[in-house]
């Protein structure tokens, strides 16, 4: 099965210069936990911001989320796949990079959606492979220096 058959196609983004407070509010209203990050200079996706990025890289360090911007704490580089890739390729990328979401690109390398662990769970992926991906991305990474 192709990625385009299981991905979430409604894609919303946020600019690197958007405050973390505004980004968190946007996530709350949309009931989502991540957004692609777009550069205001060239309108290209340059990273992802997650609710976890905001908490771990800003709130936990005592930063002011009203003045700190998305570009300061976003995850980069991006982990991507193409909409015509097999679903297994997306799961392999998630496992290798230890991410829960992968940006989906079209044949012109333009973002067209996201594929998440939840999308994989609803697709035809082998249960053993799904378990392997979940275990891998859920294993704690080495702690960052304070």
State where each predicted segment sits.
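Tandem CBS (Bateman) regulatory domains
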Residues: 1-10, 50-80, 85-95, 111-146
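Short N-terminal leader segment in a subset of presequences, especially plant chloroplast
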Residues: 8-17, 43
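The conserved cystathionine-beta-synthase
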Residues: 13-31, 38, 81-98, 104-106, ...
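A glycine-centered beta-loop-beta connector
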Residues: 27, 35-53, 94, 102-118
């Amino acid at each position: 099965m192709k990625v385009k058959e299981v991905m979430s196609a409604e894609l919303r983004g946020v600019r690197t210069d958007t405050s973390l407070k505004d980004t968190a509010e946007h996530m709350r209203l949309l009931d989502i936990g991540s957004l692609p990050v777009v550069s205001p200079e060239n309108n290209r996706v340059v990273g992802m911001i997650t609710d976890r990025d905001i908490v771990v890289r800003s709130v936990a360090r005592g930063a002011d989320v009203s003045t700190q911007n998305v570009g300061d704490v976003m995850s980069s580089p991006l982990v991507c796949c193409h909409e015509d890739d097999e679903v297994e390729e997306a799961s392999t990328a998630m496992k290798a990079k230890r991410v829960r979401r992968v940006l989906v690109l079209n044949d012109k390398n333009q973002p067209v959606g996201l594929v998440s662990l939840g999308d994989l769970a609803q697709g035809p992926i082998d249960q053993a492979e799904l378990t392997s991906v979940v275990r891998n991305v859920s294993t704690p990474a080495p702690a960052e220096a304070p």
